[in-house]
UniProtKB/Swiss-Prot annotation:
This protein's record includes keyword Glycoprotein: yes
SUPFAM superfamilies reported in the protein's UniProt record: Apolipoprotein
Pfam families with a match to the protein in the record: Apo-CIII
Protein purpose: Component of triglyceride-rich very low density lipoproteins (VLDL) and high density lipoproteins (HDL) in plasma. Plays a multifaceted role in triglyceride homeostasis. Intracellularly, promotes hepatic very low density lipoprotein 1 (VLDL1) assembly and secretion; extracellularly, attenuates hydrolysis and clearance of triglyceride-rich lipoproteins (TRLs). Impairs the lipolysis of TRLs by inhibiting lipoprotein lipase and the hepatic uptake of TRLs by remnant receptors.
InterPro entries (UniProt xref): Apo-CIII (IPR008403), Apo_CIII_sf (IPR038195)
BP GO terms, sorted: cholesterol efflux; cholesterol homeostasis; chylomicron remnant clearance; G protein-coupled receptor signaling pathway; high-density lipoprotein particle remodeling; lipoprotein metabolic process; negative regulation of cholesterol import; negative regulation of fatty acid biosynthetic process
Keywords assigned: Chylomicron, Glycoprotein, Lipid degradation, Lipid metabolism, Lipid transport, Lipoprotein, Oxidation, Secreted, Sialic acid, Signal, Transport, VLDL
Name this polypeptide is given: Apolipoprotein C-III
Site (May interact with the LDL receptor): K45
Length: 107
């Protein structure tokens, strides 16, 4: 084999292997990009779910606080209202102490 032909074949083999490595690198790069994109989407979804749970928990705590405050306020109002009208004896009577209403005659 002549040195020129050998040199040309060697050069073509090097170019072909370089092209194959470049294609392999490109496919590996594409794979890594897809992998990282999937990872970032998963991490983003996980973070969003965690944030939603925290917000739901905070909203539930705030709602419980509002309900507790409202109930306490209502109890205070009822006690105040009852205290104002307690002088009439209306609130002090129990159902057993209340006199029964007589039945109308003729029934």
């Amino acid at each position: 084999m002549q040195p020129r032909v050998f040199l040309a074949v060697t050069l073509l083999a090097l170019l072909a292997s370089a092209r194959a490595l470049e294609t392999e690198d490109a496919s590996l790069l594409g794979y890594m990009q897809d992998y990282m994109q999937g990872y970032m989407e998963h991490a983003s979804k996980t973070a969003q779910d965690a944030l939603t749970r925290v917000q739901d928990s905070q909203m539930a705590q705030q709602a419980r606080g509002w309900m507790s405050d409202s109930l306490s306020s209502l109890q205070d109002y009822w006690s105040s209202f009852k205290g104002k009208w307690s002088g009439f004896g209306f609130w002090d009577a129990t159902p057993e102490e209340a006199s029964p209403t007589p039945a109308p005659e003729g029934i």
